[in-house]
């Protein structure tokens, strides 16, 4: 049971990181188009939740 639970957690963490990578890339793309929004992007980058 513990082994199965460990793999489930690992899978969820992988999916979680992939979602954040997608969001982060989208934000960086917006940042490159609108450099004047640097402060907002800096706050966004600092607020990324890591489990």
Curated annotation (Swiss-Prot):
Highest taxon listed in the record's lineage: Eukaryota
UniProt name for this protein: Uncharacterized protein YOR376W-A
């Amino acid at each position: 049971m513990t082994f199965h639970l460990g793999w489930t957690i690992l899978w969820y963490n992988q999916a979680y990181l992939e979602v954040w990578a997608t969001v982060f890339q989208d934000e960086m793309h917006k940042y490159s188009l609108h450099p004047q929004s640097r402060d907002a992007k800096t706050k966004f980058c600092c607020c990324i939740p890591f489990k």
